[in-house]
Amino acid sequence: MNDARAIAATLACFVLLLTFGCGGSGSKTNTNTNTIVTSGSNVQPITVGSGPTGNYTNGAFTSVTVCVPATTTCQTIDGVLVDTGSSGLRLLSSALTISLPQQKAGDGNPVVECLPFVSGYTWGPVQTADIQISGEKASAVPIQVMSDTDFPVPGACADRGSSEDTLSALGANGLLGVGNFAQDCGGACVATGAGNPELYYECPASGCVVTGESLAQQVQNPVALFATDNNGVILELPAVTGPEASISGSLIFGIGTQSNNGLSGATVYTVDSDGNFTTSYKSLPYNQSFLDSGSNGLYFLTSSASGIPVCPDAAFFYCPSSTQNLSATNQGANGASGQVSFSVASADNLFNEIGRAHV
């Protein structure tokens, strides 16, 4: 998923390194040629598959353990979507069985957040948890608990699209946002008044009102709070030549902090203040490109611009009559560039082969 913000967030020194391969329709034989790191205190297993709803397509899921801060009262939640397009842990209230402490504003009122994504919004209180993933731990982390019925959604939040606060809508029990930013908003949400993007609310009994939220109290990228291995992530998946029901990979914490997370000669594309870089396709530059494991496909251009027909029943997917082998060029804010090759096959055919709906 990608949080639909155009605000001045605080850019942290995080690196996202995604290593994987994919192809079009054809043989289901997995011809993996890259070696996946599977062991280490900083390695968390992930599965790309159908998720807890059984009908998600191309979702990278993992498990996360949350605890009441400074206690052994903990719960491990499966089916959490790994999302490099956002920052912060967000859990459905329906998946959470332990009671976490509520974050409060200076006047004692509960703090609640409305976070817009391209596909809709999440609404729910900010609570505090210790987070454990693989051998890593972050203490007293502000997280969002989505769809808590104690706090009715204000109109300004509901106007941002459809709610993603149910299992059927989200397709996951939560989101693990490990993107480029230390917080989910940054400096713009600290101040009150004009310029505040209206993400954070304090909610007295009379109703919720927009409030400023300090950087430390905002929903945090948990990776930034690990004691070590806290400067980025590697999302590592095997190469595949055709549709698969599921594949296994690893989420590796840290860049260059252990023997298993070096850059290994990878090209580094730095991003701008919004987390974007430039992708050029057919010599046309698109300067709002981003890496988003929370989206379940490669999203680029419109059918009229790409020349590829869309699916008759799902206009947001392409359905060419034969597999299209294409390429584009990525360029970072640092000027580094490189070509990426990819294939576009009929989404109808691919989904039919693995028994999925258009999700």
Go through each PLM region and give its residues.
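C-terminal motif of bacterial Sec signal peptides marking the signal peptidase cleavage site
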Residues: 18-21
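Aspartyl protease catalytic domain
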Residues: 30-57, 140-286
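C-terminal catalytic lobe of pepsin-like aspartyl proteases
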Residues: 96-134, 224-227, 231-358
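Bacterial signal peptide processing site
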Residues: 23-26
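Primarily extracytoplasmic ectodomains and periplasmic/lumenal surface modules that are beta-strand-rich
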Residues: 71-73, 78, 85-89, 97-99, ...
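Aspartyl protease catalytic core from the pepsin/retropepsin fold
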Residues: 60-71, 76, 120-182, 323-358
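Short hydrophobic beta-strand that contains or immediately precedes a catalytic carboxylate
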Residues: 79-83, 89-91, 175, 288-292
